[in-house]
Amino acid sequence: MKHLATFVQMGCLLVAASLGFAACQGAAGRERARQAAWRKAIKAQIYSDYQGMYRQPTGVAFKYPYIAPGSRQYATVLWDWDSWWADVALRQILADCTGEAERSEALVYEQGCVLNYLAYTSPEDGYMPMVIDGESHPDLMKPADIYATNMHKPCLAQHAALLIKQNKGDAEWLRELFPRLQAFIGNYHQHHRHQASGLYYWQDDLAIGVDNDPSTFFRPKKSSASIYLNCMMYKELQAMQYIAGQLGLQPAVAQYQSWAQELLTSVRQHCWDEKDGTYYSADLNLLPYTGEAGIVFGKPFVLHEGAPRDYPCLIQRLGSWSGFMALWAGIATPEQAQRMVRENLLDERTFWAPYGVRTLSKLEKMYNLKPTHNPSNWQGPVWGISNYIVWSGLLNYGFEKEAKLLAEKCIRLYGQDLETDGCLHEYYHPETGDGLINPGFQNWNYLVINMIAWIEGRERIQEF
């Protein structure tokens, strides 16, 4: 009887295990079916209205056709990194479902984004505005002091390089205005770069792209060596090197290659935190050592002269998604990438959420999900662009399993949004997937198309 009871118990366990396995298989099958349905709905939506981002020239403001991010709020606006990322998505759409005629038509608008900005760029000082709208005028866009506030993010060369690379290396359309692009990069190198550390910094917190990132938001002027900015600048210098090569400008190739290598060294030295296993922004707001004597306790005294400060900056241990841009930019070493992903990205207490990557660690005191505009909220909500950049970085280092999980989170996010609201939003609640603000937003949300192409085993269009 004892053996019979044991046999019955084993049988019950096997049945329970089989039922559990079947339930898991059933749930997995239902999720696969939902993912397929969401991919189909997303593609249908985006393929049908991508031309809604095309805009025609309008007198003085826009000399060339261009791409607007989409939605009523941004209907006639050319934004720096917005139009660049929208174009990365557009390139995927064109590859997926159009022919040569549609691609030729789109190229005029794509190149126009770059050329419009260069039309506003001073060849003498390289100042380039970050935004152009229907009321802009090239002669009225400069601030009184161009070195006291931010300008266009370092991404225009990457936009141009994308188009050149996607069109068989043809850079002739850019040759005449390339000196203006060089002046723009020279402005950054001379006036936005901290000499002691080699890191680039924001002049202030105006329109930095990640509006209220605590590493820059309400910080002293010229104090934030943002990891976001430095990763973008590293890629920008590589893009300049590529474009100069396509134009046969070998001295410029050598210059940008040298600047890129110097920046890579600086970021690895000053922004990598061995303790936490990730990249952070750096704080430049340190008092200089003057060596001048003051009167202390009634006597001349040089404070700290025995061992003055010998470090140029302090690391900012603020858990922001932009630290993962070191994966996207190729700055992290393979060993660093392992720690960044295993110890930081995949931690559900901090960044890894049901609908993507939180833009600020949930453990930071500033974490919140307020639906704000001016500034837009980057202190926790999930954004399509941060999801995409982290995903792209994962693929750079061979984290395909994790990249697939993140892509599926993003597909679920947008698929459910289309089901419930019939449109996409600018940013989202990381736990529920609810759209928080700006319904009808297109722009970089369309980068989910690039994720879908990869998931489905098709050619994936990549940013430069």
Question: Residue spans of the language-model regions?
Answer:
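Bacterial Sec-dependent signal peptides at the C-terminal "C-region" and cleavage site
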Residues: V15, L19-R30
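Low-complexity, Ser/Thr/Pro/Gly-enriched N-terminal "stalk/linker" regions
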Residues: G26-L78, G112, N116, S266, ...
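Extended, well-ordered alpha-helical scaffold segments
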Residues: E31-Q45, G99-A119, D170-H189, E236, ...
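Catalytic cores of carbohydrate-active enzymes
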Residues: A33-K43, M128-P129, Q190-D204, M232-Q336, ...
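Glycine- and aromatic-rich loop/turn segments at beta-sheet edges
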Residues: Q51-Q73, T121-M141, Q190-F218, Q269-Y289, ...
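Solvent-exposed loop and edge beta-strand segments that line ligand/cofactor-binding
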Residues: Y64-W84, L107, P138-K153, S215-C231, ...
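Aromatic-rich carbohydrate-recognition surfaces in CAZymes
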Residues: T76-Y200, I227-N230, Y234, G319-S320, ...
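Non-catalytic C-terminal accessory modules of carbohydrate-active enzymes
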Residues: R342-A353, T359-K365, T372, S376, ...
